């Protein structure tokens, strides 16, 4: 298989056990059906990540959503080897991350992979421009080139004019933009985000989400994003993994998860989601033709976009595919069925 055909990131059967020993006994007990609490009591070991496998395509945003203690932050640290997995495999475009020595791993972190944490980690004694250029400085890029790149990234994240300020002169949202610019400056293949926006005020948080969405449209990085906020996961993710007790309950697109929650646990999150904002028109499309309707809508449009049309008097709207070919219709009844299900 050509390297371009390989996933940007591939994890297979990742386990992480904290505590004395090599963790093999705890893993065996998990496979035999013992609960995490009983394993902790019997072995003094905590099973934080349990047999997790997933791959991320180039340019995809993969969101891992879970509550506190679900293992999501441990997982992303295993992915980057900030924490060593107990068992499993991690590959970057086919390269075995777990087989790399310290120097090889440093090279990966310097250029192929960047991480953005909840706490910004900016150097208080360095100006904004020097914070952004730090990764390039570590790579021994000459000063003129790294300042030019840092200036470009500063403009990219909307902070043009703030180069000579210090971190303490910036708001929390601005500091996180600096952290994002620093991560982007080394031109990484993979960006890892560990709840980067959770400490920000709601309005600033939404701005940062919008910023990441905008950057992804133009830069197309491979992103793994950790969050405890289901709404944030729905906004950002091409695919979402719902994590509970160290393992994935369900993996799918936002639409797949909202329309078909796989477990009662996932359903608890889905129940409060306004379906019309997440589900596409194709989920309410039925067979038929609209003889009198002049209105059409793409099957990929969100349901909320057609509700005003139906309220204005259109009883039937033609649904088209990407080639503008009619594939069916949507009517008030099919939309009402979805909205009624939301109220149950």
Language-model segments: which ranges?
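Short coil-to-helix segment of the ABC ATPase nucleotide-binding domain corresponding to the Q-loop/switch region
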Residues: 126-133
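Conserved signature/switch motifs of ABC ATPase nucleotide-binding domains
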Residues: 110, 134, 165-168, 182, ...
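Conserved ABC ATPase "signature" region
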Residues: 22, 28-38, 95-96, 137, ...
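The conserved cystathionine-beta-synthase
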Residues: 292-323, 331-344
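Helix-to-loop junction immediately C-terminal to a conserved catalytic motif
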Residues: 80
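Conserved ABC transporter NBD signature motif
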Residues: 88-96
